Amino acid sequence: MKTDIHPKYVAAKIKCACGTVIETRSTSGDISVEICSNCHPFFTGKSKLVDTTGRVDKFKKKYKMK
């Protein structure tokens, strides 16, 4: 087998926008993410209200249906 063909597997820190830092190992070094399990709505149980009109509502509004 060939030697030294695999990438270096080094200690890395994953930094979230909320300030959480998770230490792990990676081939790419330090990683920055926007959302993690500490601030994601699925894991926290807090839902975010997204005020968007659905396709059906847009259709009804366009054709003035009730």
Curated annotation (Swiss-Prot):
Zn(2+) binds at residues 16, 18, 36, 39. Belongs to the bacterial ribosomal protein bL31 family. Type A subfamily. Gene3D superfamilies: Ribosomal protein L31. GO terms for cellular component: ribonucleoprotein complex; ribosome. Binds 1 zinc ion per subunit. Its cofactor is Zn(2+). Signal peptide: none annotated. Keywords: Metal-binding, Ribonucleoprotein, Ribosomal protein, RNA-binding, rRNA-binding, Zinc. InterPro entries: Ribosomal_bL28/bL31-like_sf, Ribosomal_bL31, Ribosomal_bL31_A, Ribosomal_bL31_sf. One of its GO terms (molecular function) is metal ion binding. PROSITE patterns: RIBOSOMAL_L31. Binds the 23S rRNA. HAMAP family: Ribosomal_bL31_1. Part of the 50S ribosomal subunit. This is Large ribosomal subunit protein bL31. GO terms for biological process: translation.
